[in-house]
Amino acid sequence: MNNLNDPPNWNIQPNPRADGGDGSKWNYALLVPMLGLAAFRWIWSRESQKEIEKARRAYHQQTAAFQQDLDAKYHAVISEHRRAVAQLSLELEKEQNRTTSFREALISQGRKLAEEKKLLEQERAQIIQEKSQRQPLRRAYLSCLEEEDEWQRRAQLVLKEVGEALEERQNIYCSLILPRSARQQLEKSLLVRTSADPVAADLEMATGLSDIFKHDKHCGDVWNTNKRQNGKLMWMYLKYWELLVELKKFKKIEKVILGK
């Protein structure tokens, strides 16, 4: 192209002649830079292609290494997750088994408690029934106790009086100075009293007293002043009569209960 701002000699002019001259010189002058530029572009393109290929190979290598590292990490994470999932599955199975066992134990315990409750209710009903059945028996028992308490008080009073009289009788018997007639009078009085008293008659005291008067000859030593050391058979009879009072009491109660 021509530069319109430059002088004419610096611009390329049209070839005035067909056979060469100054026009050919300018043509060769343009060809050399163009060839240099083409060579430079070719060299630059080739080097650039090498750099591009080198960069592409480096990129592919980096990409492959990154992909390999990423795959390794991915597989490691997957393996770790699989192990965690397997562990969690195992723990879950254990918990499920434990829960199942616990639930079965609760069900079994519930059934056992229900059975025990049923048995307790049956026992309670039986106790209530027995209690209702025993109420009349209890009332009869208490009534009989009240009646027997009065008889027993009278029996205890008779035993006390007879015991004191026997101590006095044995003391007279063992005494060296008291008259025999006093003892005989006391024995006669005891026999009459026990024969007339219903409680004493029920205990058959008259028969026992006759046996005592006839056979109890035991006395303490000469200087004895304790009346309770005199006599042996009399104390046996007194103990026997006490036991007989208790025995008769319970026999009467038993008779009332069985009769009801």
From Swiss-Prot:
* Coiled coil segments of this chain: 47-135
What domain of life does the native source organism fall in? Eukaryota
Q: Which UniProt keywords apply?
A: Coiled coil
> What name has this protein been given in UniProt?
Coiled-coil domain-containing protein 127
Organism this protein belongs to = Rattus norvegicus (Rat)
Chain's gene name? Ccdc127
